[in-house]
């Protein structure tokens, strides 16, 4: 998608995915994505009657995000292992005094993780582990190093198979 705008610059986004099954029940996914967009409107203009947060961010550059990654999926336990790398140029952020800034050097992020679903009848447990590291400019984008998530849910057909319900925690 490409959009040319007079007020907020250009917008460009490409999403490229490749999926194949080299061996039965094993799936390989690869992706290369790119996005170049003007910073969010929240960074450009904000006024406040409560605090001195009145600013107008001039000469902002497009923030560009490049992503490369992939995953391997296994039918066994509905498992997926993934790895991603992000490079963010002109990263836009608010500094210590709440003024918008853009980074002069890129922010680089690496991620690895996995996802699995275990099922017993109509009961399911989905777990996800996600490790990530901000490789450069950690002070601009503080992210947790580890994210873990688990969902336990019940899933069944209802109303003579006319609907499906899912509930859980």
Feature locations, PLM:
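Exposed, low-structure sequence patches enriched in small/polar residues
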Residues: 1-169
